[in-house]
Design a protein with these regions (language model features):
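Alpha-helix-loop-beta-strand connector modules within alpha/beta enzyme cores
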Residues: 56-75, 122-131, 179-182
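Beta/alpha (TIM)-barrel catalytic core signal, keyed to glycine-rich beta->alpha loops juxtaposed to Asp/Glu
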Residues: 108-258
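Short, acidic/polar
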Residues: 25-38, 81-96, 140-150, 196-202
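A structural motif
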Residues: 40-43, 97-100, 133, 155, ...
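Conserved, mostly hydrophobic/aromatic
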Residues: 6, 18, 46, 59, ...
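N-terminal binding-site loop/beta-alpha segment at the start of enzyme catalytic domains
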Residues: 1-70
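Active-site groove signature of glycoside hydrolases
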Residues: 92-112
């Protein structure tokens, strides 16, 4: 089993994070069964967002009974401190918890910092002081904002699109996070569906010891494939390497950065 430590957070999990955006599309009971199966199979990191309609509610419904054994990451797209607090209180209620492990700014157009006019980072610090969040993260699709977040030293984690179609600039972010002891959470590890070989995607991500891929899962068969990687992590074999190179030639420039 491959494990990853999310930088200075010390959070240590296997290299299979559950991306909970797709569970919006299934019923509450279907989601509960899927999430329970994920937990039973060894997945302990679950990522959601206030913007993902009822995803937080489904997570709280399904996993509140094992809260002390899992890590919850969620996000706020708030533009003001007032909306930050509203989102945070809603997320805490829906997730049925009194503390969120990683609370992330959701794809902001800028990098929130202490004392700026948005008040967002100051609100996050206050929430941390109050024990409502443990760590402050940021998610983004813009290289410039991601790099600024790394350079600032203010953030415990960065969530950014990363897969085997990544560019040298994307790889530089991974290295930057490692140097800053900052967790790197990889969204879109299948490039929004462009990549169809999950084993190859896993093998690629597994080469980077500080990268935690989160997989968007809504079907039992998808989950079972990723659970199989916990017991037998796919290796970067020559056939997989050749397939990746072929995909890079065919799909270069198509890497999905949007939602």
């Amino acid at each position: 089993m491959s494990e990853v430590i999310l930088g200075r957070t010390g959070i240590t999990v296997n290299k299979n994070g559950f991306g909970a955006l797709p569970i919006q599309r299934i019923t509450k009971e279907q989601a509960a069964a899927l999430l329970q199966q994920a937990y039973d199979g060894g997945i302990t990191f679950f990522d959601t967002a206030r913007a993902y309609t009822d995803s937080e509610e489904k997570l709280g419904y399904a996993l509140s009974h094992v809260r002390s054994h899992i890590y919850l990451a969620t996000k706020t797209a708030a533009q003001t401190a007032d909306d930050f607090w509203k989102d945070l209180e809603t997320s805490l209620k829906l997730l049925k918890t009194d503390c969120i492990d990683i609370y992330q700014f959701h794809n902001p157009a800028f990098c929130p910092k202490p004392g700026d006019e948005s008040g967002l980072y100051d609100a996050a610090l206050k929430a941390k002081e109050q024990g409502k969040i443990r760590f402050i993260g940021i998610t983004n699709h813009r290289l410039s904002v991601a790099q600024e977040a790394i350079d600032s030293g203010l953030y415990d984690t960065l969530q950014f699109p990363f897969c085997y179609l990544a560019t040298e600039k994307d790889l530089a972010l991974v290295q930057g996070c490692k140097e800053q002891n900052m967790g790197f959470i990889a969204m879109k590890s299948l490039s929004g569906g462009l990549i169809t070989n999950a084993a190859a995607a896993y093998a690629y991500a597994d080469q980077y010891d500080n990268v935690l891929p989160i997989w968007g899962i809504q079907k039992k068969e998808e989950l079972e494939q990723f659970l199989s990687f916990i017991k037998e992590p796919p290796a970067m074999t020559e056939p997989i390497r050749a397939m990746i190179e072929q995909d890079r030639k065919l799909l270069s420039g198509s890497f999905c950065r949007g939602c």
